[in-house]
Amino acid sequence: MEHFRNIGIIGRLGSTQVVDTIRRLKRFLLDRHLHVILDEGIAELLPGHGLQVSSRKQLGEVCDMVVVVGGDGSMLGAARALARYKVPVLGINRGSLGFLTDIRPDELETRVAEVLDGQYTVESRFLLETQVRRKLEPIGQGDALNDVVLHPGKSTRMIEFELYIDGQFVCSQKSDGLIVSTPTGSTAYALSAGGPIMHPKLDAIVIVPMYPHTLSSRPIVVAGNSELKIVVSPKMDIYPQVSCDGQNHFTCSPGDIVTISKKPQRLQLIHPLDHNYYEVCRTKLGWGSRLGGGS
């Protein structure tokens, strides 16, 4: 008996390798007599596929599982669209790093079969939601699985802002920006800026200054339920941006307020049974092996 009957497929656009992998996946799923639904974006690259085509909203509503073929960027986009529907998501890596996409293309059939047969675990990952307000009126909002970043945009000048956590003033800062990251995003941009690696099961948020003018400004780890408020200095004459996962962007004006908090809905991420977070870090980040040559 199949654990999943209606399988959605999302793929990264502009890659022939992704298209080839999706064709393999489609054949494999159809051979198991499953109902396969293609995301409308990737369907155009598969002429004559003969399958149902749906929007991501519809995939979330009708699918038992969605398979994302691509890299971490593809998974980030899918996560933001699908988290609200609680549909579990499985990743096949066709990118460079693959922190979120576990399955290698060469093991596609074997690994997907294991998942279909019930040999998998589901890990819950929380997202952040952010809103930009101008004179109390919302002008932009978005979600992020990795991080919300305040940055100068096209300017090379520093940003001035104030940070509040749960209504309490923390600091005023002059820097290149601020990264607010989930545990999932702690191995991404936040890591490059000197932030700590956080296990994805942690209920915490890390706040990482980007090249702060004050050297004592260090990363801060706060409770996952914290509510953050960033007040962009009204004295500035530049217009910084807020980016969600580096994919969605909003332009701020001096005096704007950026709020960031945990999103109620979570991503349900499927892993093979032998998934090992520390092995992923060791492989992707180039950590050393055990003494004596062991892995």
Curated annotation (Swiss-Prot):
NCBIfam families according to UniProt: PRK01231.1
Subcellular localization: Cytoplasm
Biological process annotations from GO: NAD metabolic process; NADP biosynthetic process
Pfam families: NAD_kinase, NAD_kinase_C
Leader sequence segment: none
Residues reported to bind NAD(+): 72-73, 146-147, 157, 174, 176, 187-192, 247
GO MF assignments: ATP binding; metal ion binding; NAD binding; NAD+ kinase activity
Source organism of this protein record: Azotobacter vinelandii (strain DJ / ATCC BAA-1303)
Lineage: Bacteria, Pseudomonadati, Pseudomonadota, Gammaproteobacteria, Pseudomonadales
Entry EC no(s): 2.7.1.23
InterPro entries xrefs: ATP-NAD_kinase_N (IPR017438), ATP-NAD_kinase_PpnK-typ_C (IPR017437), NAD/diacylglycerol_kinase_sf (IPR016064), NADK (IPR002504)
SUPFAM superfamilies according to UniProt: NAD kinase/diacylglycerol kinase-like
Catalyzed reactions per annotation: NAD(+) + ATP = ADP + NADP(+) + H(+)
Main location: cytoplasm
Protein name: NAD kinase
This protein's GO CC annotations: cytoplasm
Domain of life (superkingdom): Bacteria
First-level EC class: transferase
Active site: 72
Needed co-factor(s): a divalent metal cation
